[in-house]
Regions:
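Peripheral, non-AAA+ core regions of ATP-driven protein-machinery
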Residues: 1-233, 243, 345, 500-522
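Basic, amphipathic alpha-helical bundle interface domains used for macromolecular binding and assembly
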Residues: 35-46, 59-61, 68-78, 304, ...
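Conserved alpha-helical scaffold flanking the Walker A/P-loop in AAA+ ATPase domains
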Residues: 223, 277-278, 283, 294-317, ...
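The Walker A (P-loop) glycine that initiates the GxxxxGKT/S ATP-binding motif of P-loop NTPases
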Residues: 236, 298, 321
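Catalytic P-loop NTPase motifs of RecA-like helicase/translocase cores
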Residues: 115, 319-326, 369
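Walker A/P-loop
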Residues: 234-274, 339
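Short beta-strand elements
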Residues: 19-25, 296, 399-402
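Walker B catalytic acidic pair
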Residues: 314, 320-321, 332
Length: 522
């Protein structure tokens, strides 16, 4: 009997756990048995691996093979275990200490083709981060994943000045076997990505705000939303630019920093699909109004996949025709909006997906879309019921409400301000708020993220503005959460204006954006 070992990883959500792959080659009829809560993709790899080994001019054992994936209690899914299982089987009879040492320090990822080539797999970034946490020396990925793997920040040994973990890229099973036996060298993922020209690919171009005709109130609302990370809702007749403004909101946001880029790219990697390069700008996700709860939050049979809210992590989630989305689906957004993550409970495990996004809702004022109630053809009860699916608790979590005007009210506008011009003010406001929260020791990426109690206690508006907030709360026209959101809005407006503290005018503008009419004494 002979025993081979290799390392791979199991991915649950956007977190990976290192998995020990053991292969026992012993007497018995020629067959392979895989144990350890493996899914269908892993179980079906038997014939694929055997054919790939034969076509790579390598030797497959002609006896019984038992492959164990541990920890056995953890569900495992995906074809990325192929390479690790092949290497554990092929090296089971090896007595070379170098082979054993290399495999004990290396995480192997990749799906094998029938010709022995390695095919790219999903979830490379979470595995790299898990290997880095575990202190392993290297990770080998398919060359098709080189650009994604090149994003990881590899720690450096302070004494030796060399990387503590290397990320290598291989094109075939035979090449990895040659490396294991110290016959060939594998290139780094960074060098392969540079040769492929995909290591620094840009995300799709964001449309310009100058394309939006008129709508000064909605444009201003989008600027405030971008500066403070606030959620917003637009209501107006069809064709007034609601979707255009929402699609241009990511262009007003600052580019993602290195950490945000890795996090957002990791979510898209776990979701699968073709890798088009790192997520460098805030993503924009706009599912159809027929979206289901599982498509919005994530889920699916087997290992859950991230939904639209997670794909919009560090970006914008736009739900057009919000009045057509079932109330149960919309209400499922309440917890992610508050906590910044999605928790899916399964029988064997819980899955967590990050979901820190800006929500933008858009809807027509009524089914017929008329701007003026006098010209509306809908029955009164139908008009009143039109937006009833947007519950009070969800409305309470929105910061900005804005009405877009009909086409006749915006004709003749030209030379509107560009995205680049607005973004300069947004970036300046964000830098101003970030410096303020940093000096105070408050952990927040934007004004929206500041704890409400800290804001009320340590960062109130001036006395007149706070009195106005208290009066509005006392009238019962808004909840305490609504007042907190207005105070955050006031801070964002003050940051855009370059003020050191929100005043009465800033609070009045916040009331207007929040949808509460306010009269300000001269």
């Amino acid at each position: 009997m002979a025993l081979g070992r290799a390392l791979s990883a199991a991915i649950v959500g956007v977190t990976a756990t290192i998995v020990d792959v053991e292969a026992n080659v012993g007497p018995g009829l020629p067959r392979i048995q895989i144990v350890g809560l493996a899914d269908t993709a892993i179980s079906e790899s038997r014939d694929r691996m055997k054919t790939a080994v034969a076509n790579s001019q390598l030797h497959w054992p002609k006896t019984k093979v038992v492959v164990s994936l541990s920890p056995a209690s953890m569900p495992k899914a995906g074809s990325h275990f192929d390479v690790a299982m092949c290497l554990a089987i092929l090296t089971a009879s090896s007595t070379d200490p170098l082979v054993r040492q290399r495999l004990s320090e290396t995480v192997l990822l990749g799906e094998v083709g029938l010709d022995g080539s390695l095919r790219p797999v999903a979830g490379v970034l979470p595995v790299l981060m898990a290997a880095r946490r575990a202190g392993l020396r290297r990770v080998i990925v398919p060359q098709g994943n080189a650009a994604e793997a090149a994003l990881i920040d590899v720690p450096v040994d302070q004494k030796l000045g060399t990387p503590r973990m290397s990320v290598l890229a291989a094109r075939s099973l035979a090449q990895i076997m040659g490396w294991v036996n110290d016959l060939v060298e594998l290139p780094s993922a960074v060098s392969v990505a540079e040769a492929q020209g995909t290591g620094a690919s840009e995300s799709a171009a964001v449309p310009d705000m100058a394309d939006v005709c008129g709508q000064p109130e909605a444009r201003w609302a989008a600027e405030v939303a971008a500066a403070g990370g606030h959620h917003m809702m637009m209501v107006g007749p069809p064709g007034t630019g609601k979707s255009m403004i929402a699609a241009r909101l990511p262009g007003l946001l600052p580019p993602l920093d290195a950490g945000q880029c890795v996090q957002a790219t990791a979510v898209h990697s776990v979701a699968g699909g073709v890798f088009h390069g790192p997520v460098l700008v805030p993503p924009f996700v706009a599912p159809h109004y027929s979206v289901s709860r599982s498509a919005l939050l994530g889920g699916g049979s087997g290992m859950p996949r991230p939904g639209a809210v997670s794909l919009a992590h560090h970006g914008v989630l736009f739900l057009d025709e919000a009045s057509e989305i079932p109330a149960s689906v919309l209400d499922s957004l309440r917890t992610p909006l508050e906590e910044g993550e999605v928790r899916l409970v399964r029988a064997r495990h819980d899955v967590h997906f990050p979901a820190r996004f800006q929500l933008v809702l858009a809807a027509n004022p009524c089914p017929c879309g008329a701007e003026d109630p006098s010209s509306c053809r809908c029955l009164a009860r139908v008009r009143m019921r039109h937006l009833s699916n947007i519950s009070g608790p969800l409305r309470d979590r929105l910061d900005i409400f804005v009405h877009t005007r009909g086409v006749g009210a915006v004709l003749g506008h030209a030379g509107e301000e560009s995205t680049a011009s607005i973004r300069k003010r947004v970036v300046a406001a964000r830098e101003r708020s970030a410096a303020r929260w940093s000096r105070a020791g408050v952990r927040a990426r934007s004004n929206r993220d500041v704890d409400s109690q800290v804001l009320r206690r340590e960062f109130p508006a001036d006395d007149a503005a706070m009195a106005l907030l208290a009066a509005y709360l006392g009238n019962g026209d808004v909840s305490q959460r609504g007042v907190d959101r207005m105070l955050k809005l006031a801070w964002t407006i003050a940051d855009l204006a370059g003020a050191s503290r929100p005043g009465l005018d800033h609070v009045a503008q916040a009331f207007e954006l929040h949808g509460a009419p306010v009269e300000v004494a001269a």
